């Protein structure tokens, strides 16, 4: 763990994970948290730790919606390269209305840490977290399923969170590249893709 501090208080951190890969360029990944302004010194320090451990690169994921242009430029100057898209955020303005609620009720399930609740249907589920006036859905499923079934699940999650939490103005969720079924479900409910996305960054150095 590499931590950035300001006046004794932690303002950011990089948790380094050793995947044990034989290729030193693929061995280490980082989980970055905290202030965007601390990114460059944090990553420089993390890269040094990885280098001393025998790694030849560091990979991590950044949410571009939370990064000002100055931070993007600073990462480029550091030598970090933006790579593949991990997921893109989709958004629905609640004031636009939702289709009629499904007649089926999802089964109550234990929610992930930080989530307000979880709804599930079959082998699919959504954890729902309230962040200010936004509801954030984290979706997962065991099988591909159908767009209609996923739309019913998302509709149920949206209706439950708007009924239980006053002031929700928008619902957001993320979609992985190529997940056409989930995209179709979201489109049917009035969701639209945004410019916010998560991408994998890669910082490499010589031997």
Predicted regions, residues:
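Conserved donor-binding loop and adjoining core beta-sheet/short helix segment
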Residues: 1-44, 121-147
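Amide-forming acyltransferase catalytic core, primarily the GNAT-like/NAT-type
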Residues: 1-16, 76-133
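Hydrophobic beta-strand segments of well-ordered beta-sheets in folded domains
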Residues: 23-28, 55-61, 134-137, 167-174
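Conserved active-site alpha-helix within GNAT-family acetyltransferase domains
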Residues: 64-84, 177-195
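Intrinsically disordered, low-complexity segments enriched in Gly and acidic/Ser/Thr residues
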Residues: 112-171
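Hydrophobic multi-pass inner-membrane translocation pores used for secretion
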Residues: 146-159, 168-207
């Amino acid at each position: 763990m590499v931590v950035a501090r300001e006046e004794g208080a932690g303002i950011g951190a990089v948790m380094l994970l050793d995947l044990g890969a034989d290729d030193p360029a693929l061995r280490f990944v980082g989980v970055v948290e905290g202030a965007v302004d601390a990114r460059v010194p944090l990553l420089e320090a993390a890269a040094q730790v990885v280098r001393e451990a025998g790694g030849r690169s560091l990979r991590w994921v950044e949410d571009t919606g939370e990064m000002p242009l100055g931070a993007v430029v600073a990462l480029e100057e550091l030598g970090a390269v933006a790579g593949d898209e991990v997921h893109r955020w989709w958004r629905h303005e609640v004031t636009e209305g939702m289709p009629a609620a499904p007649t089926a009720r999802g089964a109550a399930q234990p929610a992930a840490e930080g989530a307000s609740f979880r709804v599930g249907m079959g082998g699919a589920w959504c954890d729902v977290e309230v962040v200010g006036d936004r509801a954030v859905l984290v979706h997962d499923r065991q099988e591909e399923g159908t767009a209609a079934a996923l739309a019913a699940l998302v509709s149920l999650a949206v209706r439950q969170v708007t009924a239980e939490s006053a002031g929700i103005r928008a619902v957001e969720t993320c979609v992985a590249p190529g997940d056409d079924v989930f995209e179709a479900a979201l489109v049917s409910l009035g969701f639209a893709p945004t410019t916010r996305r998560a991408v994998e960054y890669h910082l490499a150095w010589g031997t």
